[in-house]
A protein has these predicted regions:
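Short glycine/proline- and charge-enriched loop/turn segments
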Residues: 66-74, 179-184
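Short polybasic amphipathic segments
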Residues: 152, 169-183
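Active-site loop of classical SDR/Rossmann-like NAD(P)-dependent oxidoreductases
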Residues: 189-200
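C-terminal helix-rich "cap/oligomerization" subdomain common to oxidoreductases
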Residues: 6-11, 20, 201-242
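Alpha-helical elements of Rossmann-like donor-binding domains used by nucleotide-donor carbohydrate transfer enzymes
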Residues: 9, 32-39, 89, 120-122, ...
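Contiguous beta-strand/loop segments that form the cofactor/metal-binding neighborhood of enzyme cores
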Residues: 88-169, 199-208
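Beta-strand-loop-alpha-helix segment that lines the small-molecule cofactor/substrate pocket
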Residues: 1-29, 44
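NAD(P)-dependent dehydrogenases' Rossmann-like dinucleotide-binding region
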Residues: 22-29, 43-64, 78, 82-86, ...
Length: 242
């Protein structure tokens, strides 16, 4: 889905057939650290969430990419592609049902020969419950031992949580690093063993026609906001004109 018109068609089809349209937002549903962060917030460890900062850097791995990867009309743009994951997390952690795109930008700063590739993007958004900043890119250097140093910082009124999802550049081994800071402590948690309930819940939803894995309205809202951010984005660098 790369346009709002396509999203409208999906919504109409789901409504007509009673189908479930669900997306595996893997930066939430496949990351145990995110599950643990949600538990910490539910425990009141950082107060009320008022902002998220989501960073989604990726490695380009140019030799592995098909031709369509460098054609904006086919892949939909970097905000539709990667930033949708961060929008999902913003809505989820702030408890927002809707949001406004304050500003968005896409750019090609490092690949001037591929004018259809957006290698950088950012979004500022806000809702009645909080604000969010998102940065995504295709700049992960080869020296990093994984495809991207994905991070999420969740700011609350009484503290904050930082997730280093796939690597800790400070030297801790493994993945799913959680840091919690509040009025009582500055704590490190290895969240590798936290649950990943999305797929089990989705199967339950398919069988019982429920919405435990992810509300349908939430899924469609993430798609809508990503598509709107993409459509209104300021274009910088060596991007082809549209």
């Amino acid at each position: 889905c790369t346009t709002l018109e396509q999203l409208d068609s999906i919504k109409a089809c789901a409504a007509e057939n009673g189908s479930i349209w669900s997306i595996d937002f893997s930066e939430r549903f496949e990351v145990p650290a995110v599950t643990r962060a949600a538990e910490l917030i539910a425990e009141g460890r950082i107060g009320k969430v008022v902002q998220t900062v989501g960073l989604g850097p990726h490695r380009l791995n140019r030799p592995t990419r098909p031709d369509w990867f460098f054609n904006e009309a086919e892949y939909g743009g970097i905000l539709t592609d990667i930033a949708s994951h961060q929008i999902d997390q913003f809505l989820f952690f702030t408890g927002s049902n809707d949001a406004e795109i304050i500003s968005s930008t896409v750019a090609n700063f490092a690949n001037p020969s591929d004018t259809g590739l957006q290698d950088f993007g950012e979004i500022n958004l806000r809702s009645d419950h909080g604000l969010g900043y998102i940065r995504v890119d295709w700049y992960t250097p080869d020296g990093l031992p994984t495809w991207g140093d994905g991070r999420l910082t969740i700011l609350g009124t009484e503290g904050y949580i930082e997730l280093r999802k796939y690597v800790d550049v400070a030297g801790r081994e493994g993945t799913n690093h959680v840091f919690v800071v509040n009025g009582d402590s500055c704590e490190y948690i290895n969240a590798t063993d936290a649950a990943l309930p999305y797929f089990e819940e989705l199967i339950h939803d398919v069988i019982h026609r429920t919405e435990t894995a992810m509300p349908q309205k939430h899924c469609f809202k993430v798609m809508e906001l990503a598509l709107k951010a993409q459509a209104q984005a300021v274009r910088l660098g060596a991007l082809s004109k549209v």
